[in-house]
């Protein structure tokens, strides 16, 4: 049986990367929420 997690750096960056987050209003909300919470890593 094939495992469900087949890692790809490109796919990860395009969907969860910093620039992907900054591209939309909701993504910016995510970044701001993580900044406010004091997260060390804001995005993948």
From Swiss-Prot:
Gene3D superfamilies: 1.10.287.3980. It holds the Pfam family Ribosomal_L34. The keyword Ribonucleoprotein applies. One of its GO terms (biological process) is translation. InterPro entries: Ribosomal_bL34 (IPR000271), Ribosomal_bL34_CS (IPR020939). The keyword Ribonucleoprotein applies. GO terms for cellular component: ribonucleoprotein complex; ribosome. One of its GO terms (molecular function) is structural constituent of ribosome. Keywords: Ribonucleoprotein, Ribosomal protein. Belongs to the bacterial ribosomal protein bL34 family. NCBIfam families: rpmH_bact. This is Large ribosomal subunit protein bL34. It comes from Aliivibrio fischeri (strain ATCC 700601 / ES114) (Vibrio fischeri). The gene is rpmH.
């Amino acid at each position: 049986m094939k495992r469900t997690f087949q890692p790809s750096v490109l796919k990860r960056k395009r969907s969860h990367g910093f620039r992907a987050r900054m591209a939309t209003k909701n993504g910016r909300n995510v970044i701001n929420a993580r900044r406010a919470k004091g997260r060390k890593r804001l995005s993948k």
